[in-house]
Amino acid sequence: MNIQSILSDKIKQAMILAGADQSCDALIRQSGKPQFGDYQANGIMAAAKKLGLNPREFAQKVLDNAQLSDIAEKLEIAGPGFINIFLNPTWLTTEISAALSHKNLGIQATNKQTVVIDYSSPNVAKEMHVGHLRSTIIGDAVARTLEFLGHNVIRANHVGDWGTQFGMLIAYLEKMQHEHASEMELQDLEAFYREAKKHYDEDEIFAEKARNYVVKLQSGDEYCRTMWKRLVDITMQQNQHNYNRLNVTLTEKDVMGESLYNPMLPSIVEDLKKQGLAVENDGALVVYLDEFKNKDGDPMGVIVQKKDGGFLYTTTDIAAAKYRYETLKANRALVFSDTRQSQHMQQAWLITRKAGYVPDSFSLEHKNFGMMLGKDGKPFKTRTGGTIKLADLLDEAIERATVLINEKNTNLSNDEKEAVIEAVGIGAVKYADLSKNRTTDYVFDWDNMLSFEGNTAPYMQYAYTRIRSIFNKTDINSTALLAAPLTIKDDKERTLAIKLLQFEEAVQTVGKEGTPHVLCAYLYELAGIFSSFYEHCPILNAEDESIKLSRLKLALLTEKTLKQGLTLLGIKTVEKM
């Protein structure tokens, strides 16, 4: 149930009947103040101006043609030409009851699309660090949301599994007689990487062997491929442990690394040359883009093949877009990476489109995000200035949550306490990130994210358990509750009912824009509205049984909505806290 969408369609139709053209937009928005209705149509004045009409007179014509008697109990013209829409309580009760009986809380499946979501993307032979957190959890929340909306989601973990570093690693493993790479742990690989790089820089014979191994690896040499595959497998097994701890849905089956596209690169570059898009410059192949200018004001050159024959990230990203359209048959491809890659992605996709590899109908979307900062406003690091490993961050989250929960509640069993600590600790880290607009930088603050006050995971998880506790105090059969009539008389009941029915608006926005913070804001508002409802409208002590059952229905849908919303964010809930 998307109230905004329904009202938009109906008001737009009335505007067209009143004389506006087909391209008009009703601009339906949720009202900020009750006296201005539940929703407002803000597009009347622009349409009236186009027609050369008085906005209020045109607004009246729109009302005369509006078919809203079932949804709205009152429509009024306000100010210079706004239309205030007051929803019908009878319609609200019908829709609330329908949402309660629907498996997806009343959210209907949209026109199904195949959507590729490229997220997380760590590097092979290195441990995940805090820099991977945002892409991993934001991308996963959007993937969950799009699946919930009925789309076919293909997760693409675009891992860095190709390049000269593998020649170094294979050569050094051989030097140290560590052919049994499968027995190694990732921490060993990180140390190996440092030593391999040192040897590569200081020992020309070693460097030559490493370069030879790169060539052999790229040409399919069985020994090199076997060693490379072991390095990839060890890395992804370790990364899977992080994904599981984060309650992220990525698996090893979702790995679509750079190596997947490697066989495509020579033919793509050759085709770009044939089309006249790629031209030679100092031995390299370059595509010049008029849409981007260099510091001299000339078209910017984007290298797609180096003079030594090597390919670049741009070439790989062109291949990835082509593959996702041609092979995966996707309608949309979303890439979650930081803002610093924005120009790179724009250029790669511009070349992709100029070459005709994807049609205009194929949506390529860079969902960029800002940086995670420390309290000093600088990139989040260890005290000594080093990179923070993701596993260490999650360990600290559990340690801090353990202290917090032990202080708050000693009435939980050990198993219950363990579940709460994990849900709160990991949930706090994720929610602190997801609740911020992804395009902005944000400050990582343990105290804020673990607070039981404000827009935090602990507050949301506690709000859920409070509602669960209401139902733990009653033995009402769920079937009987669903069959009971719902009445909406009190203003607090009405406000809660409307907010519950706005769930789909938030979810659709996340699916369209890739902005989980919109869902976080919605859930936080819902929890606050329920708290106000709970204080002013007795539930278990209601004046009669019918009101009690009616309010329990509102409480039940709130519980279900909070749980579903947090699940879409990848945040666990618990029954007791």
UniProtKB/Swiss-Prot annotation:
It is found in: Cytoplasm. GO terms for cellular component: cytoplasm. It catalyses: tRNA(Arg) + L-arginine + ATP = L-arginyl-tRNA(Arg) + AMP + diphosphate. A motif ('HIGH' region) lies at residues 122-132. GO terms for biological process: arginyl-tRNA aminoacylation. One of its GO terms (molecular function) is ATP binding. Its EC number is 6.1.1.19. Belongs to the class-I aminoacyl-tRNA synthetase family. This is Arginine--tRNA ligase. The gene is argS.
